[in-house]
């Protein structure tokens, strides 16, 4: 689903901004394992990068990539097993903690972050949280025990993170924010604080995201449907349409 959606955006000349945790480096010790499992995705991202249409934000699960030395080592090139040579991948790609969009003709800037900045365990104590994920929570997930510190798996933590983000928005002149981290898609009503969340790309049957077209924001979902002839098709649905 992710590859199909990303290819669609590439063909339509979109710019892709990844809001963090795009590369799972907590549960996976070695990037090469991630690359081999998602090679087609990375090669498609390379096409975006070559056209200067790829921008990356680091989250808690790929926070090590905030180091340019680390991101260069992991992402600049890959080993092609067919030719037996190293080939360029995402050479020179920089990971940012946040990005500010300043659209022409729009009366407000838009702050893009992962969102773990409002999550003490996953921002300040991220190394400790990563250790626990690797040695404790990952094995326990096999028997159905979820990580209580993860907002994506603990509803109470999710609400706390959202509350902190909204408090920050209110304290900063209703700064518009688009975040991730919680895996819960959010799209505010006109009278609510301008907090958006793009949801998640890890669910097996659907992925969600935020689209900005002609200064208008939509919450969208790519998912699989079953057609009458028994075939499956990936389609895009608009969950929340732009509002004035």
Where is each model-derived feature located?
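Extended recognition/assembly regions associated with phosphoester-bond processing machinery
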Residues: 1-244
């Amino acid at each position: 689903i992710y590859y199909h959606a990303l290819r669609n955006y590439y063909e339509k000349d979109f710019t892709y901004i990844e809001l963090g945790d795009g590369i799972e480096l907590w549960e996976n010790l070695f990037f090469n394992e991630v690359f081999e499992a998602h090679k087609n995705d990375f090669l498609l991202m390379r096409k975006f990068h070559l056209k200067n249409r790829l921008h990356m934000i680091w989250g808690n699960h790929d926070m090590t990539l905030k180091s340019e030395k680390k991101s260069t080592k992991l992402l600049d090139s890959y080993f092609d097993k067919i030719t037996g040579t190293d080939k360029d991948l995402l050479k020179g790609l920089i990971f940012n903690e946040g990005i500010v969009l300043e659209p022409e003709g729009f009366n407000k800037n838009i702050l893009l972050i992962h969102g773990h900045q409002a999550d003490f365990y996953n921002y300040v104590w991220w190394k400790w949280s990563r250790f626990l994920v690797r040695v404790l929570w990952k094995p326990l997930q096999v028997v159905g025990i979820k990580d209580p510190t993860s907002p994506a798996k603990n509803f109470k933590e999710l609400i706390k993170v959202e509350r902190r983000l909204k408090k920050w928005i209110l304290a900063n002149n209703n700064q518009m924010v688009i975040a991730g981290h919680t895996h819960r898609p959010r799209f505010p009503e006109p009278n609510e604080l301008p907090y958006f969340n793009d949801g998640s790309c890890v669910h097996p049957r659907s992925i969600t995201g935020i689209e900005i077209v002609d200064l208008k924001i939509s919450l969208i979902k790519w998912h699989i449907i079953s057609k009458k002839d028994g075939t499956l098709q990936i389609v895009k649905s608009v969950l929340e349409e732009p509002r004035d």
